[in-house]
């Protein structure tokens, strides 16, 4: 009986909604996404000013320079900077955007709703399946557009289905359809699981809740960074596969 009461108090996967232009939107996800986007833009202008200045690089600049160097190495080894220089800024932007979206939920910003329950104001956007699907579909469209640009409007779908062995064309088609699904569900599953754990910790008595909450929030920073890096890394890999030519093997 007690377990049933506690389970009923856990609210995970529920979102505050509103109707905009005859469409129902999750306002908490929109808020987190908008704040993350503004932070990314602010960081871009800040780092741009630091790069063009003669001052000693600070910690923030060195952190993002390290990320850019790491991503540049991945793009160079997978595709080649001369072939697809546009993949590097795209991968870095996706990484930073997802990273900030994930890390926003770590901030101790809470409020009490009309039912008297304490709720996080900034929920992780990646815990909303709509957010991760939109990101994955954006990447899906971008790397196929790059593949058409590199291989041609006829050559790209032929190479896509044929792969390295023509007889595996049906499997290659299923694999291609599964890419955005797996890319989105990987990110969603990890972040959503974190939301469930936070909801469980919230049921602890206040005098001991701070300890597991602090431990999990620290680990959540690590999980958010790893998942953002994996998403960006797979983005580079998918661009590499979509832009590969036959002569690249010779």
Curated annotation (Swiss-Prot):
GO terms for biological process: proton motive force-driven plasma membrane ATP synthesis. Pfam families: ATP-synt_A. It is a multi-pass membrane protein. One of its GO terms (molecular function) is proton-transporting ATP synthase activity, rotational mechanism. The chain crosses the membrane at residues 27-47, 83-103, 129-149, 191-211, 219-239. It is found in: Cell membrane. It comes from the Bacteria. Signal peptide: none annotated. One of its GO terms (cellular component) is plasma membrane. Disulfide bonds: none annotated. HAMAP family: ATP_synth_a_bact. Belongs to the ATPase A chain family. NCBIfam families: ATP_synt_6_or_A. F-type ATPases have 2 components, CF(1) - the catalytic core - and CF(0) - the membrane proton channel. CF(1) has five subunits: alpha(3), beta(3), gamma(1), delta(1), epsilon(1). CF(0) has three main subunits: a(1), b(2) and c(9-12). The alpha and beta chains form an alternating ring which encloses part of the gamma chain. CF(1) is attached to CF(0) by a central stalk formed by the gamma and epsilon chains, while a peripheral stalk is formed by the delta and b chains. This is ATP synthase subunit a. It comes from Mycobacterium ulcerans (strain Agy99).
